[in-house]
Amino acid sequence: MLEVNTYFDGTVKSIAFQTATLPATVGVMAKGEYTFGTDCKEIMTVVSGELIVQLPNQEEWQTFIDGQTFEVEANQSFNLKVPVETAYLCKYIR
């Protein structure tokens, strides 16, 4: 069953689903800055657009564009700058 999630007053929306192997969400972020927390390990892929990411315990920011992936371990938080509306796929490792 699909589940729609809305965050940050509607500027981030995702649809949760089950892949063949892992739970996942696919969503869109409006331009802005966000902080997300993880309950489990997350593998995030940019589908379209750009994410500028500050990973946990890192001072520098890294840019990810279409097709690029980054990972965040469980029980961490990470910061995002979204310069253009961006679509993403997030897989959850439980």
From Swiss-Prot:
EC numbers, comma separated: 2.4.2.1, 2.4.2.2
Keyword Membrane: no
Gene Ontology CC entries for this record: cytosol
Catalytic activity: a purine D-ribonucleoside + phosphate = a purine nucleobase + alpha-D-ribose 1-phosphate; adenosine + phosphate = alpha-D-ribose 1-phosphate + adenine; cytidine + phosphate = cytosine + alpha-D-ribose 1-phosphate; guanosine + phosphate = alpha-D-ribose 1-phosphate + guanine
Source organism superkingdom: Bacteria
Enzyme class of the recorded protein, top EC level: transferase
Record GO terms (molecular function): guanosine phosphorylase activity; purine-nucleoside phosphorylase activity; thymidine phosphorylase activity; uridine phosphorylase activity
Annotated keywords: Glycosyltransferase, Transferase
Stored InterPro entries: Ppnp, RmlC-like_jellyroll, RmlC_Cupin_sf
Family: Belongs to the nucleoside phosphorylase PpnP family.
PANTHER family reported for this sequence: PYRIMIDINE/PURINE NUCLEOSIDE PHOSPHORYLASE, PYRIMIDINE_PURINE NUCLEOSIDE PHOSPHORYLASE
Its biological purpose: Catalyzes the phosphorolysis of diverse nucleosides, yielding D-ribose 1-phosphate and the respective free bases. Can use uridine, adenosine, guanosine, cytidine, thymidine, inosine and xanthosine as substrates. Also catalyzes the reverse reactions.
HAMAP family: Nucleos_phosphorylase_PpnP
Protein name in UniProt: Pyrimidine/purine nucleoside phosphorylase
